[in-house]
Amino acid sequence: MLQTFSPSYKPLHLPISSLSLSSSSSSSASSVAFPVTRLLIPPRLRVLPNPRRRCSALPFDIRGGKGMSEFYEVELKVRDYELDQYGVVNNAVYASYCQHGRHELLESFGLSCDAVARNGDALALSELSLKFLAPLRSGDKFVVKVRLSGSSAARLYFDHLIFKLPNQEPILDAKGTAVWLDKNYRPVRIPPEVRSKLVQFLRNEES
């Protein structure tokens, strides 16, 4: 028959004031052969400062990282094949205008999307929201304004504006997110050499 053994001793609760950091107290405490149900911590060690987090990425690569203060501008002209049956630029075409502006901006950083693709990576658009304000028609000249509004470890955030020329009539307001992908199309950190180019561009903009 299985019997249950109950210890005859009770757990010892030692007051904190009795704990000493001397070697003699440590040796005597280690000789106690019964469990202690209370963690004994000296008052001066009860509150420890939070450890500092180290990050190898540049300050640009944190969520909500600093972006550009000015817009990069690209002037374009509406082509006839971009029109729909109503004689205005098809809504889907504006995404291409924004893409062209982003690529021109990145090339000004020294970053070519073609070069990224040749290395096996990709800078892919993951989000794009468009707010249509007014239409463009055949032959209209307009300017696409793009800036890098922020960043995270693997993503770049862009603001896009389109204005009709020469009167600067607002046409479009758009926001986009591009994510860096590896060869398996998984999000990865933006490479250090790319971060360096972006940070250098922002520093030059401030100076």
Curated annotation (Swiss-Prot):
Active site (record annotation): D84
Family, similarity comment: Belongs to the 4-hydroxybenzoyl-CoA thioesterase family.
Tissue expression per record: Mostly expressed at low levels in glandular trichomes (lupulin glands), and, to a lower extent, in stems, leaves, flowers and cones.
EC number assigned by the record: 3.1.2.-
Lineage: Eukaryota, Viridiplantae, Streptophyta, Embryophyta, Tracheophyta
Keywords carried by this UniProt record: Chloroplast, Hydrolase, Lipid metabolism, Plastid, Transit peptide
GO molecular function: fatty acyl-[ACP] hydrolase activity
Transmembrane segments: none
Full protein name: Acyl-acyl carrier protein thioesterase TE3, chloroplastic
Organism: Humulus lupulus
Location of the transit peptide in the chain: 1-63
SUPFAM superfamilies, alphabetized: Thioesterase/thiol ester dehydrase-isomerase
Annotated function: Acyl-ACP thioesterase involved in the production of fatty acids and beta-keto fatty acids. May play a role in cuticular wax synthesis.
